[in-house]
């Protein structure tokens, strides 16, 4: 048994190392490419030793963009941050209030409304996205932060998770609040919201990354280059046809795009893990 256990441990560690290398090696190649100049990156085979042009590449794309996209990449990062933060705050606000109303208020057809919200999870994005674009166009929200963020603030998943969490809270909390004369909103802010902070943190991280990584939606909504986002902007830096792509600058843009969600995860890691664990209970 001991020998079998030791062999299983060795196999597990080997598979773990292989998995880590499979994930990190492409990122390392991208980092190396970002440190090279335009001539070095096209040498075959490309070196795996970092060069000395990283800061120059970062400065160029930050101020002037790259390739066919001359919009400063710093502006694209700002647009992505505004979009991701607005989607995150809006999605959490709408979802937690919706779940609170469904669980703690008694009104006709409340369960029907919840299942109508839940059923939207079964519709593919491709089915929902073009009718949503049509609505945004008719409301004259194209090329605006409102059009970028407002349609993505509704979340059946977050509503479902908050509903399930609220249903685990003891009824005695509500009864005690009623005896003390607390209004429904005071009960929400004084009792429910503090108990939900770990769930809020977990959903904040997940939703921020979701908003930051949006690619198709900005492409459909935005035609103004000054409202372009970082993820969509990287694609526009890649030349089409016979044009030459400045891969060193594209990889530098990729590194910058990874930093904000990485910082969010690192800063909120403890709360994020606790929120996921609490949601499983």
From Swiss-Prot:
| Keyword Nucleotide-binding recorded | no
Q: Where are the transmembrane segments?
A: 14-34, 85-105, 113-133, 142-162, 188-210, 247-267
Q: Which residues form the ABC transmembrane type-1 domain?
A: 77-268
- Topologically, how does it sit relative to the membrane? Multi-pass membrane protein
Primary place of residence?
membrane
InterPro entries given for it?
A: MetI-like, MetI-like_sf
Listed under GO biological process in this entry are:
transmembrane transport
Alphabetical keyword list: Cell inner membrane, Cell membrane, Membrane, Transmembrane, Transmembrane helix, Transport
Where located?
Cell inner membrane
Q: Which GO terms describe its cellular component?
A: plasma membrane
- Annotated function: Part of the ABC transporter complex UgpBAEC involved in sn-glycerol-3-phosphate (G3P) import. Probably responsible for the translocation of the substrate across the membrane.
PANTHER family, A to Z: ABC TRANSPORTER PERMEASE PROTEIN MG189-RELATED-RELATED, SN-GLYCEROL-3-PHOSPHATE TRANSPORT SYSTEM PERMEASE PROTEIN UGPE
What assembly does the database describe for this protein? The complex is composed of two ATP-binding proteins (UgpC), two transmembrane proteins (UgpA and UgpE) and a solute-binding protein (UgpB).
What family, per the record?
A: Belongs to the binding-protein-dependent transport system permease family. UgpAE subfamily.
Protein name (record): sn-glycerol-3-phosphate transport system permease protein UgpE
Species of provenance = Pectobacterium atrosepticum (strain SCRI 1043 / ATCC BAA-672)
């Amino acid at each position: 048994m001991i020998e079998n256990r030791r062999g299983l441990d060795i196999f597990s560690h080997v598979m773990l190392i292989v998995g880590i290398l499979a994930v990190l090696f492409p990122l390392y190649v991208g980092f190396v490419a970002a440190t090279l100049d335009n001539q070095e990156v096209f040498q075959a085979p490309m070196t795996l030793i970092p060069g000395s042009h990283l800061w120059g590449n970062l400065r160029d794309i930050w101020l002037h963009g790259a390739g066919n996209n001359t919009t400063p990449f710093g502006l694209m990062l700002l647009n992505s941050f505004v979009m991701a933060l607005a989607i995150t705050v809006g999605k959490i606000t709408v979802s937690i209030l919706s779940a609170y109303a469904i669980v703690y208020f008694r009104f006709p057809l409340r369960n029907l409304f919840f299942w109508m919200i839940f059923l939207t999870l079964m519709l593919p994005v491709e089915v929902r996205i073009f009718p949503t674009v049509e609505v945004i166009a008719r409301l004259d929200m194209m090329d605006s932060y409102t059009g970028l963020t407002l349609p993505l603030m509704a979340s059946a998943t977050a509503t479902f998770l908050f509903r399930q969490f609220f249903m685990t809270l003891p009824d005695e909390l509500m009864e005690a609040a009623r005896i003390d004369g607390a209004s429904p909103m005071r009960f929400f802010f004084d009792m429910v919201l503090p108990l939900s902070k770990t769930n809020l943190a977990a959903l904040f991280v997940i939703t921020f990354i979701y908003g930051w990584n949006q690619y198709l939606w900005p492409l459909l909504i935005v035609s103004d280059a000054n409202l372009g986002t970082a993820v969509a902007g990287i694609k526009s830096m890649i030349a089409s046809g016979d044009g030459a792509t400045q891969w060193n600058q594209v990889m530098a843009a990729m590194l910058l795009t990874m930093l904000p969600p990485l910082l969010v995860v690192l800063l909120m890691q403890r709360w994020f893990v606790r929120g996921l664990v609490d949601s499983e209970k």
